[in-house]
């Protein structure tokens, strides 16, 4: 399938990290400019493009043409699609292929794909030869608005999501909104959960705009570019203030403590996409916030109503086979949440809501309260 690309004027968002600052270039039709942008940053570099089998069929040839057209030498590394590649075996494969391709420290890795490819390729770049620069070319909505920005890279452990990794900032992000036309409706919806997250954590006006325009984002063009750019600006500002997640950056994990546990409980097998887990997790976080007297019940209903209107799952029972594999066991979910990256001295850290657009970090929620909360949610779910 060939997607026609009608170029729009690109939007540039700066991630301000001093000497390690970089641009996020957003727009419909910006992919063909990738080669000249990279050549300006690293003239003469050899470039290894890491992608997955699905993305390769749509965008690898065009990406390589842009790179070679700018005088760059390329090689390709193609991995299997999905979370199965975000593993010890997956990163070993990519590292060995980079070494075989003789990628040196002054060369580049290009991550062409969604969140899995970006995390995997970025982590491999971080550790091969003790660090090779890389460029993110995100091809999913989730990657364009979240995982490609901020330098978090890594893989999953059998014990949990994203437990092995490194902070390794890209030197450039090129987000062509036209490539999102090749996503399945389910993949696009999963990415939309991360867009809604930005409204929930700090921008009620953006959330209200999304309630009106979420269908226009699916259609594309100006609404889609606005949503991606607004999300990237929000994340870039937080990353600039708290690169290593010592404080404010934790707000970006709204819904992720619950969501990552749900993903782990399904075995990262594709029954629950990351964004779908985040959607359910954000509703659970809002409901827990209401139980703690922090947010009005009307706001919780508004959040769930919007996510459901966008076609996202919002309840545990929305997960296929949710009564299997620990999904219907509050104690099993608590065990998985105990492996969350935000755990400090054995205590869970939750991102909770005081209102739509007002998120807070909380480390003083009693585990027994969370366990009872989950048990009630499971008991209320139909068999």
Swiss-Prot record:
Gene3D superfamilies the record matches: 3.40.50.1970, Dehydroquinate synthase-like - alpha domain
Cofactor note: Binds 1 divalent metal cation per subunit. Can use either Co(2+) or Zn(2+).
CDD domains: DHQS
Enzyme Commission number(s): 4.2.3.4
UniProt-listed GO biological process terms: amino acid biosynthetic process; aromatic amino acid family biosynthetic process; chorismate biosynthetic process
Catalytic activity: 7-phospho-2-dehydro-3-deoxy-D-arabino-heptonate = 3-dehydroquinate + phosphate
Function: Catalyzes the conversion of 3-deoxy-D-arabino-heptulosonate 7-phosphate (DAHP) to dehydroquinate (DHQ).
Protein name: 3-dehydroquinate synthase
Native source species: Nitrobacter winogradskyi (strain ATCC 25391 / DSM 10237 / CIP 104748 / NCIMB 11846 / Nb-255)
